Regions:
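Solvent-exposed loop/turn segments at secondary-structure junctions
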Residues: 86-89, 125-128, 144-148, 250-254, ...
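N-terminal hydrophobic or amphipathic helices and topogenic motifs
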Residues: 2-77, 82-85, 103-115, 167, ...
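Gly/Ser-rich catalytic serine loop of serine hydrolases
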Residues: 37-38, 64, 145-147, 229-230, ...
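Beta-sheet entry/capping signal
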Residues: 78-79, 138, 243-244, 301, ...
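Ligand-binding "clamshell"
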Residues: 89-109, 255-291, 439-454, 470, ...
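Short helices/loops that flank or line small-molecule/ion binding pockets
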Residues: 65-81, 85, 89-94, 132, ...
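Extended intrinsically disordered, low-complexity coil regions enriched in Ser, Thr, Gly, Ala
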Residues: 51-56, 91-95, 146-164, 327-328, ...
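A conserved helix-loop-strand patch within extracytoplasmic ligand-binding domains
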Residues: 103-181, 452-528
Length: 729
């Protein structure tokens, strides 16, 4: 942060135990606001607004909010809007000096200390002898996984010892929670998707059906339901036999017609004198009195670091000015960038570290809500440092957002090493290309449980051959003697589909074994087929040399190590994977690249900012059709080598149904959470400039696999052809 200074000492405050001096400067300043890259245009529009404050906002793009937290810590950015869950991630970061300096409050309750307070409401005449005697009551809840109606009572009752073991090893974290509620309460209403997987959801609702008995539609036990949500809890309590309800204070006051913040009392048919707040110590408080909360959810706010705290008053003024302008002009950037709207306002708070901010609301243990021992994890097997970093970032983001089990990360050198680790219970999952899934099933006793989804195509994609538009190739026969670029050995688009095409056209003979050697001879100009030198693939040395001849290793390395990773089957080889194979073609190493249908559109026309791709145009490339001729890159449905199944997540076949279910649940949950809110964590897309880490960049979601699809069956036929000549182990 650049500035010239004439300062007056104002105060000294503590952030995370550090004494930080605050100053008010007489000169204007520049503040770097971190924003997800998708919102840069909106942010720049906001930054261009003229305000009374002469401070300047500069927009700093980041992949997502997780990267914004890192940028603020590293002084690459000055501030960003954050949720309490992001504050939790920040508070757990080593050697951090973050500070929450402003809250986003509602106009309805501008003086409220917290966004909302979780309370328990009971009938006034209910006979209870302390909190332990709530066992057997009929309980009303907002919905599964929600804060005041689910996470807060579960966490606090566990801490009190009212709820027992939540770590039965044979049950998933979610089932442990549901079983605890089912055992504690005789009946309840807890609507919602108990699992994002429909099969698991139905199974759990049959097993713990008493948790749906107080709902409007017990058989459905899902939204919409008149006895769900904040107000629904109170209807359940007042009119459907409920004896205790878990909701938030503002809705209690509205339900009984009491004043709320700036809103005066309203008429109500409900009598507050018939009910009471049940306090965590077992005492009671009248509904008309000061409520006793079990925990509170803090406000959203803005977070900075210790350096910016010194001049934060100037930044606060700037935000206030922008809020006024944005509201007056109904500017879209107000909500998109500052996360404010016509029902909220920015409010200065006493500067405080994010951990202390959460503790003030008794909210830290609500976020953590991880029961054990044993502490369960889903161990993702990764192949390089980039993938390891993404996995660890995913783990932090998912845990803060209530996704269990926690993800852990296991680093191995090769895909085969990962498959061995999963087989031997050293890891739990890895995402594999369809061709490698077949290998995993046959040689490592693994099974696919989750499928990537690709937009309108769903769980499938097209394998294509790409050539430069100015090349002379018109058919696969023309490719004899050419130079070829492949995604990797054994992979669908880069190896299996082109090999099948050459066999199908009799360009490689059915008895020309081994086929991998025949492929190297067909593309006698040389190839880059990453993974060819991996001993696990058992490719003869001379053949492997030919198939690796065009690979470049890490072509971007400047330290003399570029060839150390030559022909590796991961991102340490620049020409590995879909993007890598296309780069091999672009940079003149090859004449043809075997990739998937979205590879060219995803790396041209400004879609990939890397230097080698920044100026590429999709119109300069065409698809080579297996039946002859060429087609534009967007006509893949009529010009492709194969219509193939998606990449899939595999796990060990030896796992129990319960263990598989909890892995499915965690994966489908991250797919939904971070597809709906990619600004929080970008699950699909490049990470630190690297492509296809953990999942393919082109994926748009994750779904459970319960049976073989028609595309998988068709692909199995393709595999049976290309595997007919495999060298014997």
């Amino acid at each position: 942060m650049k500035f010239t200074v004439i300062v007056v000492l104002l105060a000294a405050i503590a952030v995370n135990g550090r004494l930080i001096r605050r100053y008010r400067r007489s000169t204007h300043n520049e503040y770097k606001m971190c924003i997800p890259e998708d919102l840069m245009n909106s942010c720049n529009e906001m930054a261009s607004q003229e305000t009374k404050s002469t401070a300047k906002i500069v927009c700093i793009p980041a992949r997502d909010r997780m990267e914004c937290i890192d940028k603020i810590k590293q002084r690459q950015a000055d501030f960003a809007p954050v949720d309490p869950e992001d504050m939790y991630v920040a508070a757990k970061s080593p050697n951090q000096d973050f500070a929450v300096f402003e809250e986003i409050r509602t106009l309805e309750e501008p003086e409220a200390e917290f966004r909302y307070e979780g309370v328990a409401v009971i009938h006034k005449d209910l006979k209870l002898d302390g909190i332990p005697s709530i066992k057997g009551l009929k309980s009303c809840h907002t919905g599964v996984g929600r804060n005041v109606g689910y996470k807060i009572p579960l966490t606090k009752l566990k801490n009190m010892g009212i709820i027992g073991n939540l770590a039965e090893p044979d049950l998933s974290p979610r089932e442990n929670e549901l079983k605890a509620f089912s055992t504690l309460f005789s009946k309840a209403c807890i609507v919602g998707k108990w699992s994002p997987d429909p099969v698991i959801n139905d199974k759990l609702k049959q097993r713990y059906s008493n948790l749906c008995e107080l709902c409007e539609d017990p058989a459905k036990c899902d939204y919409p339901d008149k006895y769900s949500g904040y107000e629904g809890v109170l209807r359940c309590l007042a009119h459907n036999g409920g004896e205790i309800g878990w909701t938030k204070v503002i809705y209690v006051r509205k339900f009984f017609g009491l004043p709320v913040g700036t809103t005066p009392a309203q008429p109500s048919n409900e009598n507050p004198d018939d009910y009471a707040y049940l306090c965590p110590d077992g005492s009671r408080v009248p509904i008309t009195g000061t409520p006793c909360r079990w925990a509170a959810r803090p406000w959203q706010g803005y977070m900075t670091n210790a350096v910016v705290v010194k001049t934060v008053d100037e930044l606060r003024t700037k935000i206030a000015n922008l809020y006024t302008i944005g509201n007056r002009n109904h500017a879209p950037w107000l909500e998109k960038v500052l996360e404010l709207n016509n029902k909220t306002l920015p409010r200065e708070n006493k500067i405080i570290g994010p951990g202390d901010y959460l503790d003030k609301a008794n909210y830290t243990d609500v976020v953590e809500r991880d029961y054990g021992p044993p502490f369960k994890t889903t161990r993702f097997c990764v192949l390089n440092q980039d993938e390891l970093e993404k996995c660890r970032t995913l783990s932090r983001a998912a845990f803060s957002r209530n996704i269990r089990p926690r993800f852990d990360c296991v680093l191995e050198k090769t895909v085969d090493d990962c498959m061995k680790a999963i087989r031997d219970n050293g890891a739990d999952i890895i995402t594999l290309d369809g061709g490698l899934v077949d290998k995993a099933q046959k040689h490592y006793n693994l099974k696919p449980i989750i499928s990537e989804v690709y937009g309108e195509l769903g769980g499938s994609y097209y394998a294509v051959a790409v050539v430069r538009k100015n090349s002379l190739y018109k058919s696969f026969a023309d490719l004899r003697g050419a130079k070829s670029c492949h995604t990797g050995y054994g992979r669908t688009a880069g190896y299996n589909a082109p090999l099948y095409t050459l066999l199908n056209q009799n360009l490689i003979k059915a008895d020309q074994c081994p086929y991998v050697a025949a492929l190297s001879e067909y593309f006698s100009g040389g190839s880059c087929l990453p993974g060819s030198k991996d001993p696990a693939n058992k490719i003869p040395e001379k053949t492997a040399e030919k198939l690796c001849s065009l690979c470049g290793g890490n072509v971007d390395a400047n330290d003399g190590t570029s060839l150390d990773s030559k022909c590796n089957a991961d991102s340490t080889e620049s020409y590995s994977g879909y993007t890598g194979a296309f780069r091999c073609l672009v940079q003149g190493q090859g004449d043809v690249a075997f990739v998937k249908h979205v590879t060219v559109p995803g790396n041209t026309d400004g879609k990939n900012p890397e230097s080698w791709a920044a100026n590429l145009k999709s119109e300069d490339y065409e698809l080579l059709c297996p039946d002859g001729g060429r087609a534009p890159v967007d006509q893949y449905e009529k010009c492709h080598l194969a219509h193939v199944p998606p990449h899939m997540v595999v796990t060990s076949n030896s796992k129990t149904d319960g263990e598989v279910d909890e892995i499915r649940n965690a994966l489908v949950s991250i797919g939904k959470q971070f597809t709906d809110r990619s600004d929080l964590f970008k699950l699909f897309g490049s990470f630190n400039g690297k492509k296809d880490l953990l999942f393919k960049d082109s994926a748009t979601g994750l779904v459970s696999l319960n049976e073989e699809s028609p595309v998988q069956k068709k692909y199995a036929e393709l595999l049976s052809v290309i595997n007919a000549c495999q060298p014997k182990a």
